[in-house]
């Protein structure tokens, strides 16, 4: 296990790790297999590399636009970095691509806003999300803008990340240790279904350009969805 901030320093050295962590928190909730589909939302997120690759291939075959991986890199950016789907779901490789995209956005923003480091950084967040310096600042009724979400995540993701918890004495030294809960297996090894009428309660936030489908020919999988994006203080990447 590698703490996220350590991974970010190794794989995305040109971006402050706390900044990268804030983006990842909003984009994928630190899920390396996350897929966001433009115009829809997956019924649930893939829970394994094989399932993520199969889902991406299925979406591509059906002509969908989507972003993938821990930093939600858009599928059309993969050829630019010589990346396959399998590589894009590798946290380090995905962070490297995401950091390059953000760095390019920031370099262009600081030229337009000389001496305004934080202003340029926020403009770069918008660029990362929407492909321009304004789209990420737009809000929807009852929802903050993408840039506001990223900035708000900074306070959360900069807290210390605990890899191994502190040992605590139990009242009874002979207390039984709870057996680990056995995870349910995916209903099948096919692609995850896509919902063309997404609700606002599912899926991580994704960008429109670097952005989030139920395939009508299939039925939704019955497997429980993986945990959401509440992975903050104890974030680790396997």
From Swiss-Prot:
The keyword Phosphoprotein does not apply. It holds the Pfam family SLT. Gene3D superfamilies: 1.10.530.10. Keywords: Virulence. The keyword Nucleus does not apply. Residues 197-238 are annotated as: Disordered. InterPro entries: Lysozyme-like_dom_sf, Transglycosylase_SLT_dom_1. SUPFAM superfamilies: Lysozyme-like (SSF53955). Belongs to the virb1 family. This is Type IV secretion system protein virB1. It comes from Brucella melitensis biotype 1 (strain ATCC 23456 / CCUG 17765 / NCTC 10094 / 16M).
């Amino acid at each position: 296990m590698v703490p996220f901030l350590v991974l970010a320093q190794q794989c995305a050295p040109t971006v402050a790790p706390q900044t990268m962590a804030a983006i990842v928190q909003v984009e994928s909730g630190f899920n390396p297999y996350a897929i966001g589909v433009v115009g829809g939302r997956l019924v649930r997120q893939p829970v394994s590399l094989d399932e993520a690759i199969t889902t991406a291939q299925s979406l591509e075959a059906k002509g969908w636009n989507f972003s993938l991986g821990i930093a939600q890199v858009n599928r059309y950016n993969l050829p630019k970095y010589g990346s396959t789907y399998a590589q894009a779901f590798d946290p380090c490789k995905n962070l490297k691509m995401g950091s390059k995209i953000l760095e390019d956005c920031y370099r262009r923003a600081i030229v337009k806003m000389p001496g305004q480091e934080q202003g340029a950084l926020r403009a770069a967040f918008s660029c990362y999300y929407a492909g321009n310096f304004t789209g990420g600042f737009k809000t929807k009724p009852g929802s903050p803008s993408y840039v506001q979400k990223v900035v708000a995540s900074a306070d959360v993701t900069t807290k210390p990340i605990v890899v191994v918890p502190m040992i605590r004495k139990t009242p009874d030294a002979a207390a039984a240790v709870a057996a680990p809960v056995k995870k349910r297996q995916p209903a099948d090894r096919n692609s995850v279904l896509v919902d063309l009428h997404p609700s606002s309660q599912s899926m991580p936030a994704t960008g429109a350009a670097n952005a989030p489908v139920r395939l009508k020919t299939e039925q939704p999988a019955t497997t429980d969805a993986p945990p959401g994006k509440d992975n903050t203080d104890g974030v680790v990447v396997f």
